[in-house]
Amino acid sequence: MWSGELTARGLEAHSSQKTIPDETIYFHPCANRYSDILCNWAVANQEEQFCISCACTRTIPDQHFEKNQKRWRDLEMAKRRLFITLLNLNLPIENFTQKEHGLAFDFLEDQRSNPYLELEHVLTGHSQGIITVNAMEADEGFLHTMKEEMGESYRTILGHLRHEVGHYYWDILIHTSAQLDKFRELFGDERQDYGQALEKYYSKDRPKFRSNLYITQYASSHPHEDWAETWAHYLHIVDTLETAVSYG
């Protein structure tokens, strides 16, 4: 499908700009169409190079290493799948160049995959809009090893991204809104010490998991994680229903 067809069919363009003029919109391929990730998304604004998904990527693994080319491709493919859901739900997406603490993705390595780096251990997580993912999560071997070590039967790149973006949207939708009291009624008080909560969760003395109260065992560790796990599963359900509908 070429840009003229997109315009003729009246498809909605997802641009990082808040508004798009009423005149004819000319699409062009994302600049990463010609990179190793082969991004197939289009861009509506002629002044922008990258699609709304690629524009949120801040750091990628060193592409001089052949393994990292596939890692980056798989990470971005999962991120585009995430963004389709976010866009369909009309959730706000502003990247790190558009506002302070805007959405940014850092796909990082550590010494386990690149001995020349100073970072010994990269943990997947979120902080003030920045979502960090260990690039090795794109490796099947590493993924299965972590499944065994962490006791996680369901562990995917997309699952990580759904979970971490839940923390990001908590900051936007809940933290400074009238919804905070309702959040605490349902999930608990997020002001309890996060470090101590996780230390207790990973200790031998953690309480027995109660499946009638939490959607996953990790959700029981802290209200923030309860929210993020619930959010991730909601996005998973939405995607599953869309798949079912597509099959009629």
Regions found by a protein language model. Name each.
Residues 155-175, 228:
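Active-site recognition of the HExxH zinc-binding catalytic motif
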Residues 28-31, 66-140, 151:
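Auxiliary, metal-adjacent structural segments of Zn-dependent hydrolase domains
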Residues 1-8, 159-160, 167:
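Long, charged N-terminal interaction/targeting segments
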Residues 87-91, 169-179, 232-240:
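Hydrophobic/aromatic-lined pockets within catalytic cores
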Residues 155-158, 181-187:
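Alpha-helical scaffolds flanking conserved acidic
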Residues 5-14, 20-68, 84, 130-143, ...:
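Metalloprotease/metallohydrolase-associated module, dominated by Zn2+-dependent proteases
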